[in-house]
Protein backbone atom coordinates (compact mmCIF):
# COMPACT_ATOMS: atom_id res chain seq x y z
CA UNK A 1 0.00 0.00 0.00
CA UNK A 2 1.75 3.13 -1.20
CA UNK A 3 0.83 5.53 1.57
CA UNK A 4 2.89 8.67 1.98
CA UNK A 5 2.23 9.11 5.68
CA UNK A 6 3.57 5.82 6.98
CA UNK A 7 4.76 6.08 10.54
CA UNK A 8 7.22 3.79 12.29
CA UNK A 9 5.65 1.46 14.83
CA UNK A 10 5.71 2.76 18.39
CA UNK A 11 8.43 1.63 20.72
CA UNK A 12 7.34 -1.65 22.30
CA UNK A 13 8.46 -0.33 25.67
CA UNK A 14 5.42 1.94 25.58
CA UNK A 15 3.01 -0.97 25.18
CA UNK A 16 2.83 -2.05 28.82
CA UNK A 17 3.18 1.11 30.93
CA UNK A 18 4.07 0.69 34.58
CA UNK A 19 1.49 1.27 37.25
CA UNK A 20 3.32 4.51 38.11
CA UNK A 21 2.52 6.08 34.71
CA UNK A 22 0.63 9.33 34.97
CA UNK A 23 -2.71 8.56 33.35
CA UNK A 24 -4.84 11.57 32.45
CA UNK A 25 -8.43 12.25 31.47
CA UNK A 26 -8.48 12.51 27.65
CA UNK A 27 -9.57 15.82 26.17
CA UNK A 28 -10.17 17.38 22.77
CA UNK A 29 -7.13 18.91 21.09
CA UNK A 30 -8.34 19.48 17.52
CA UNK A 31 -10.25 22.76 17.68
CA UNK A 32 -9.73 24.23 14.19
CA UNK A 33 -9.02 22.86 10.72
CA UNK A 34 -5.30 23.82 10.91
CA UNK A 35 -5.04 21.62 14.04
CA UNK A 36 -5.54 18.58 11.78
CA UNK A 37 -1.82 18.69 11.04
CA UNK A 38 -1.12 17.98 14.72
CA UNK A 39 -3.39 14.95 14.52
CA UNK A 40 -1.71 13.53 11.41
CA UNK A 41 1.73 13.90 13.03
CA UNK A 42 0.65 12.61 16.43
CA UNK A 43 1.58 9.43 18.25
CA UNK A 44 -2.16 8.86 18.63
CA UNK A 45 -2.67 8.75 14.85
CA UNK A 46 0.29 6.42 14.32
CA UNK A 47 -0.86 4.06 17.05
CA UNK A 48 -4.51 4.15 16.03
CA UNK A 49 -3.99 3.42 12.33
CA UNK A 50 -1.37 0.83 13.22
CA UNK A 51 -3.86 -0.92 15.47
CA UNK A 52 -6.49 -0.95 12.71
CA UNK A 53 -4.00 -2.42 10.20
CA UNK A 54 -2.72 -5.02 12.66
CA UNK A 55 -6.24 -6.35 13.14
CA UNK A 56 -6.83 -6.13 9.39
CA UNK A 57 -3.95 -8.55 8.85
CA UNK A 58 -5.03 -10.79 11.72
CA UNK A 59 -8.50 -11.56 10.34
CA UNK A 60 -7.44 -12.01 6.73
CA UNK A 61 -9.11 -15.06 5.19
CA UNK A 62 -10.89 -16.11 8.39
CA UNK A 63 -14.60 -16.64 9.05
CA UNK A 64 -16.49 -15.19 12.01
CA UNK A 65 -17.28 -18.81 12.88
CA UNK A 66 -13.56 -19.61 12.92
CA UNK A 67 -13.00 -22.11 15.73
CA UNK A 68 -9.88 -21.39 17.69
CA UNK A 69 -8.27 -21.62 21.05
CA UNK A 70 -6.42 -18.43 21.85
CA UNK A 71 -3.36 -20.43 22.88
CA UNK A 72 -3.00 -21.82 19.35
CA UNK A 73 -2.93 -18.42 17.69
CA UNK A 74 0.61 -17.46 18.73
CA UNK A 75 2.51 -19.10 15.86
CA UNK A 76 -0.23 -18.29 13.36
CA UNK A 77 -0.05 -14.56 14.08
CA UNK A 78 3.70 -14.46 13.61
CA UNK A 79 3.50 -16.46 10.38
CA UNK A 80 0.96 -13.93 9.11
CA UNK A 81 3.25 -11.04 10.01
CA UNK A 82 6.01 -12.60 7.92
CA UNK A 83 3.57 -13.03 5.04
CA UNK A 84 2.30 -9.47 5.45
CA UNK A 85 5.63 -8.04 4.35
CA UNK A 86 5.08 -9.70 0.97
CA UNK A 87 1.48 -8.56 0.59
CA UNK A 88 0.03 -5.35 -0.81
CA UNK A 89 -1.08 -4.09 2.61
CA UNK A 90 2.08 -3.15 4.45
CA UNK A 91 2.52 -3.68 8.17
CA UNK A 92 4.98 -0.80 8.43
CA UNK A 93 2.27 1.11 10.30
CA UNK A 94 1.14 -1.80 12.44
CA UNK A 95 1.23 -1.35 16.18
CA UNK A 96 2.86 -4.32 17.96
CA UNK A 97 0.42 -5.67 20.51
CA UNK A 98 2.05 -6.55 23.84
CA UNK A 99 3.34 -10.08 24.11
CA UNK A 100 2.52 -12.29 27.02
CA UNK A 101 4.97 -14.56 28.77
CA UNK A 102 2.62 -17.47 28.13
CA UNK A 103 -0.24 -18.29 25.79
CA UNK A 104 -3.11 -18.71 28.21
CA UNK A 105 -6.46 -17.45 26.95
CA UNK A 106 -7.17 -13.83 27.79
CA UNK A 107 -9.92 -13.37 30.34
CA UNK A 108 -10.20 -9.78 29.11
CA UNK A 109 -11.98 -10.92 25.95
CA UNK A 110 -14.78 -12.62 27.87
CA UNK A 111 -14.98 -9.69 30.30
CA UNK A 112 -15.34 -7.25 27.40
CA UNK A 113 -18.12 -9.35 25.91
CA UNK A 114 -19.81 -9.38 29.33
CA UNK A 115 -19.49 -5.58 29.46
CA UNK A 116 -21.21 -5.29 26.08
CA UNK A 117 -23.88 -7.74 27.20
CA UNK A 118 -24.59 -5.36 30.08
CA UNK A 119 -25.06 -2.45 27.67
CA UNK A 120 -27.41 -4.65 25.64
CA UNK A 121 -29.45 -5.53 28.74
CA UNK A 122 -29.79 -1.85 29.63
CA UNK A 123 -31.43 -1.25 26.23
CA UNK A 124 -34.07 -3.86 27.12
CA UNK A 125 -34.55 -2.14 30.48
CA UNK A 126 -34.95 1.28 28.82
CA UNK A 127 -37.73 1.02 26.22
CA UNK A 128 -38.43 3.89 23.79
CA UNK A 129 -40.85 6.54 25.01
CA UNK A 130 -43.86 7.88 23.13
CA UNK A 131 -42.94 11.16 21.47
CA UNK A 132 -44.03 13.22 18.43
CA UNK A 133 -40.67 13.00 16.70
CA UNK A 134 -40.03 9.82 14.74
CA UNK A 135 -36.24 9.94 15.11
CA UNK A 136 -33.99 10.40 18.13
CA UNK A 137 -36.03 8.77 20.87
CA UNK A 138 -35.30 10.54 24.15
CA UNK A 139 -35.13 7.26 26.07
CA UNK A 140 -31.61 7.01 24.64
CA UNK A 141 -30.56 9.79 27.00
CA UNK A 142 -31.74 7.72 29.95
CA UNK A 143 -29.76 4.75 28.65
CA UNK A 144 -26.68 6.92 28.08
CA UNK A 145 -26.91 8.46 31.56
CA UNK A 146 -26.65 4.95 32.99
CA UNK A 147 -23.49 4.31 30.99
CA UNK A 148 -22.05 7.70 31.92
CA UNK A 149 -22.55 6.85 35.58
CA UNK A 150 -21.30 3.26 35.42
CA UNK A 151 -18.55 3.44 32.74
CA UNK A 152 -15.61 3.39 35.15
CA UNK A 153 -17.12 0.52 37.13
CA UNK A 154 -17.62 -1.43 33.90
CA UNK A 155 -14.06 -0.83 32.73
CA UNK A 156 -12.76 -1.79 36.18
CA UNK A 157 -14.17 -5.28 35.62
CA UNK A 158 -11.81 -5.65 32.64
CA UNK A 159 -8.67 -3.91 33.91
CA UNK A 160 -6.62 -5.68 36.63
CA UNK A 161 -6.25 -3.93 39.97
CA UNK A 162 -2.57 -3.05 39.47
CA UNK A 163 -3.65 -0.93 36.48
CA UNK A 164 -6.66 0.63 38.22
CA UNK A 165 -5.17 4.10 37.72
CA UNK A 166 -5.77 3.69 33.97
CA UNK A 167 -9.52 3.13 34.34
CA UNK A 168 -10.71 6.78 34.26
CA UNK A 169 -8.67 7.45 31.11
CA UNK A 170 -9.76 4.32 29.27
CA UNK A 171 -13.41 4.70 30.31
CA UNK A 172 -13.67 8.02 28.46
CA UNK A 173 -13.29 6.20 25.14
CA UNK A 174 -16.03 3.75 26.07
CA UNK A 175 -18.42 6.62 26.84
CA UNK A 176 -17.52 8.29 23.54
CA UNK A 177 -18.17 5.10 21.55
CA UNK A 178 -21.95 4.77 21.77
CA UNK A 179 -23.24 7.98 20.23
CA UNK A 180 -24.04 11.54 21.28
CA UNK A 181 -26.71 11.97 23.95
CA UNK A 182 -27.51 15.56 22.97
CA UNK A 183 -28.06 14.95 19.27
CA UNK A 184 -29.03 11.28 19.68
CA UNK A 185 -26.84 10.37 16.74
CA UNK A 186 -24.09 7.88 15.97
CA UNK A 187 -21.36 7.76 13.34
CA UNK A 188 -17.84 6.73 12.42
CA UNK A 189 -16.32 9.02 15.05
CA UNK A 190 -18.08 7.03 17.76
CA UNK A 191 -16.96 3.80 16.13
CA UNK A 192 -13.39 5.16 16.15
CA UNK A 193 -13.70 5.83 19.88
CA UNK A 194 -14.45 2.15 20.48
CA UNK A 195 -11.43 1.13 18.41
CA UNK A 196 -9.41 3.63 20.49
CA UNK A 197 -10.83 2.03 23.65
CA UNK A 198 -9.56 -1.38 22.49
CA UNK A 199 -6.24 0.12 21.41
CA UNK A 200 -5.76 1.60 24.90
CA UNK A 201 -6.46 -1.79 26.47
CA UNK A 202 -3.74 -3.21 24.23
CA UNK A 203 -1.29 -0.47 25.17
CA UNK A 204 -1.64 -1.17 28.88
CA UNK A 205 -1.31 -4.92 28.30
CA UNK A 206 -4.88 -5.98 29.12
CA UNK A 207 -5.29 -7.29 25.57
CA UNK A 208 -2.43 -9.16 23.90
CA UNK A 209 -1.25 -10.33 20.52
CA UNK A 210 -2.90 -13.67 21.28
CA UNK A 211 -6.26 -11.88 21.36
CA UNK A 212 -5.93 -10.36 17.90
CA UNK A 213 -8.64 -12.37 16.13
CA UNK A 214 -10.93 -12.40 19.16
CA UNK A 215 -10.73 -8.60 19.43
CA UNK A 216 -12.47 -8.34 16.06
CA UNK A 217 -14.61 -11.48 15.94
CA UNK A 218 -15.81 -11.58 19.54
CA UNK A 219 -15.51 -8.07 20.99
CA UNK A 220 -15.92 -5.71 18.03
CA UNK A 221 -18.58 -7.87 16.43
CA UNK A 222 -20.55 -7.88 19.70
CA UNK A 223 -20.13 -4.10 19.85
CA UNK A 224 -21.63 -3.87 16.35
CA UNK A 225 -24.64 -5.91 17.46
CA UNK A 226 -25.24 -3.60 20.40
CA UNK A 227 -24.82 -0.46 18.28
CA UNK A 228 -27.30 -1.75 15.70
CA UNK A 229 -29.76 -2.45 18.49
CA UNK A 230 -29.26 1.10 19.79
CA UNK A 231 -29.75 2.56 16.32
CA UNK A 232 -32.96 0.62 15.73
CA UNK A 233 -34.44 0.94 19.23
CA UNK A 234 -33.91 4.67 19.63
CA UNK A 235 -34.03 5.58 15.93
CA UNK A 236 -30.67 7.30 16.15
CA UNK A 237 -29.68 9.74 13.42
CA UNK A 238 -26.50 9.15 11.39
CA UNK A 239 -23.78 11.57 12.51
CA UNK A 240 -22.32 13.43 9.56
CA UNK A 241 -23.95 11.16 7.00
CA UNK A 242 -23.06 11.77 3.35
CA UNK A 243 -26.34 10.19 2.27
CA UNK A 244 -26.23 7.89 -0.73
CA UNK A 245 -22.67 9.04 -1.47
CA UNK A 246 -21.28 7.76 1.82
CA UNK A 247 -20.15 4.19 2.38
CA UNK A 248 -22.62 3.61 5.23
CA UNK A 249 -24.69 5.78 7.55
CA UNK A 250 -23.09 4.46 10.73
CA UNK A 251 -20.06 2.16 10.33
CA UNK A 252 -16.80 1.84 8.42
CA UNK A 253 -14.39 -0.52 10.20
CA UNK A 254 -16.44 -3.72 9.66
CA UNK A 255 -16.22 -3.09 5.91
CA UNK A 256 -12.41 -2.91 6.15
CA UNK A 257 -11.99 -5.96 8.35
CA UNK A 258 -14.85 -7.74 6.59
CA UNK A 259 -13.21 -7.31 3.19
CA UNK A 260 -9.95 -8.66 4.65
CA UNK A 261 -11.84 -11.76 5.80
CA UNK A 262 -12.90 -12.38 2.20
CA UNK A 263 -9.46 -12.04 0.58
CA UNK A 264 -8.71 -15.15 -1.51
CA UNK A 265 -12.17 -16.60 -0.87
CA UNK A 266 -12.64 -19.61 -3.18
CA UNK A 267 -15.90 -18.40 -4.71
CA UNK A 268 -17.27 -15.21 -3.11
CA UNK A 269 -16.21 -12.17 -5.12
CA UNK A 270 -17.04 -8.48 -4.57
CA UNK A 271 -19.83 -8.70 -7.15
CA UNK A 272 -21.63 -11.23 -4.95
CA UNK A 273 -22.35 -8.88 -2.05
CA UNK A 274 -25.18 -7.27 -4.02
CA UNK A 275 -26.69 -10.73 -4.53
CA UNK A 276 -29.39 -11.30 -1.90
CA UNK A 277 -28.96 -15.08 -1.97
CA UNK A 278 -25.19 -14.89 -1.44
CA UNK A 279 -25.64 -12.47 1.46
CA UNK A 280 -28.32 -14.57 3.15
CA UNK A 281 -26.22 -17.72 2.90
CA UNK A 282 -22.92 -16.23 4.12
CA UNK A 283 -23.61 -13.25 6.38
CA UNK A 284 -23.00 -15.20 9.59
CA UNK A 285 -19.42 -15.87 8.47
CA UNK A 286 -18.39 -12.43 7.19
CA UNK A 287 -18.72 -8.98 8.74
CA UNK A 288 -18.92 -7.31 5.34
CA UNK A 289 -21.98 -9.32 4.35
CA UNK A 290 -23.57 -8.79 7.76
CA UNK A 291 -23.24 -5.05 7.15
CA UNK A 292 -24.91 -5.43 3.76
CA UNK A 293 -27.77 -7.41 5.32
CA UNK A 294 -28.32 -4.71 7.94
CA UNK A 295 -28.41 -2.01 5.25
CA UNK A 296 -31.00 -3.90 3.21
CA UNK A 297 -33.13 -4.39 6.33
CA UNK A 298 -33.01 -0.69 7.19
CA UNK A 299 -33.39 0.82 3.71
CA UNK A 300 -35.87 0.38 0.90
CA UNK A 301 -35.54 0.71 -2.84
CA UNK A 302 -32.84 -0.38 -5.29
CA UNK A 303 -29.44 -0.99 -3.67
CA UNK A 304 -27.69 1.11 -6.33
CA UNK A 305 -29.79 4.10 -5.30
CA UNK A 306 -29.63 3.99 -1.49
CA UNK A 307 -26.01 2.73 -1.31
CA UNK A 308 -24.34 4.01 -4.45
CA UNK A 309 -20.79 3.91 -3.09
CA UNK A 310 -21.10 0.26 -2.12
CA UNK A 311 -22.71 -0.53 -5.46
CA UNK A 312 -19.64 0.92 -7.18
CA UNK A 313 -17.33 -1.12 -4.94
CA UNK A 314 -19.08 -4.32 -6.06
CA UNK A 315 -17.44 -3.79 -9.47
CA UNK A 316 -13.90 -3.98 -8.04
CA UNK A 317 -12.28 -7.22 -9.27
CA UNK A 318 -10.80 -8.58 -6.02
CA UNK A 319 -11.24 -8.37 -2.27
CA UNK A 320 -7.61 -7.37 -1.79
CA UNK A 321 -8.21 -4.30 -3.95
CA UNK A 322 -11.45 -3.59 -2.08
CA UNK A 323 -9.54 -3.81 1.20
CA UNK A 324 -6.75 -1.51 0.04
CA UNK A 325 -9.25 1.00 -1.32
CA UNK A 326 -11.31 1.00 1.86
CA UNK A 327 -8.23 1.67 3.99
CA UNK A 328 -7.36 4.66 1.80
CA UNK A 329 -10.99 5.80 1.92
CA UNK A 330 -11.12 5.45 5.72
CA UNK A 331 -8.09 7.67 6.09
CA UNK A 332 -9.41 10.27 3.65
CA UNK A 333 -13.09 10.30 4.62
CA UNK A 334 -12.87 9.68 8.37
CA UNK A 335 -9.41 10.18 9.85
CA UNK A 336 -8.61 13.26 7.77
CA UNK A 337 -11.98 14.97 8.17
CA UNK A 338 -12.21 17.75 10.76
CA UNK A 339 -15.93 17.17 11.55
CA UNK A 340 -14.99 13.65 12.69
CA UNK A 341 -11.64 14.23 14.41
CA UNK A 342 -12.65 17.40 16.26
CA UNK A 343 -14.43 15.11 18.73
CA UNK A 344 -11.49 12.70 19.24
CA UNK A 345 -9.92 12.87 22.70
CA UNK A 346 -6.24 12.55 23.58
CA UNK A 347 -4.64 11.36 26.80
CA UNK A 348 -1.46 9.63 27.93
CA UNK A 349 -2.19 6.43 25.99
CA UNK A 350 -3.17 8.13 22.74
CA UNK A 351 -1.19 11.38 22.99
CA UNK A 352 -1.31 14.42 20.73
CA UNK A 353 2.47 14.89 20.80
CA UNK A 354 4.33 14.16 17.54
CA UNK A 355 5.28 10.57 16.83
CA UNK A 356 8.62 9.66 18.35
CA UNK A 357 11.36 8.60 15.95
CA UNK A 358 13.96 5.93 16.40
UniProtKB/Swiss-Prot annotation:
The gene is PTPA. It is an enzyme of class 5 (isomerase). It is found in: Cytoplasm; Nucleus. Residues 1-20 are annotated as: Disordered. Changing residue 185 to A: Impairs ATPase activity of the PP2A(D):PPP2R4 complex; no effect on interaction with the PP2A(D) complex. The modification N-acetylalanine is found at residue 2. Associates with PP2A heterodimeric core enzyme PP2A(D), composed of a 36 kDa catalytic subunit (subunit C) and a 65 kDa constant regulatory subunit (PR65 or subunit A). Interacts with the catalytic subunit PPP2CA (via C-terminus). Interacts with PPP2CB. Changing residue 298 to R: In PARK25; likely pathogenic; decreases PP2A complex levels; impairs PP2A phosphatase activation. This is Serine/threonine-protein phosphatase 2A activator. The lineage of its organism: Eukaryota, Metazoa, Chordata, Craniata, Vertebrata. One of its GO terms (molecular function) is metal ion binding. One of its GO terms (biological process) is mitotic spindle organization. PPIases accelerate the folding of proteins. It catalyzes the cis-trans isomerization of proline imidic peptide bonds in oligopeptides. Acts as a regulatory subunit for serine/threonine-protein phosphatase 2A (PP2A). Modulates PP2A activity or substrate specificity, probably by inducing a conformational change in the catalytic subunit, a proposed direct target of the PPIase. Can reactivate inactive phosphatase PP2A-phosphatase methylesterase complexes (PP2A(i)) in presence of ATP and Mg(2+). It catalyses: [protein]-peptidylproline (omega=180) = [protein]-peptidylproline (omega=0). It is linked to Parkinson disease 25, autosomal recessive early-onset, with impaired intellectual development: An autosomal recessive, early-onset form of Parkinson disease, a complex neurodegenerative disorder characterized by bradykinesia, resting tremor, muscular rigidity and postural instability, as well as by a clinically significant response to treatment with levodopa. The pathology involves the loss of dopaminergic neurons in the substantia nigra and the presence of Lewy bodies (intraneuronal accumulations of aggregated proteins), in surviving neurons in various areas of the brain. Its EC number is 5.2.1.8. It holds the Pfam family PTPA. Widely expressed. SUPFAM superfamilies: PTPA-like. InterPro entries: Phstyr_phstse_ac, PTPA_C_lid, PTPA_sf.
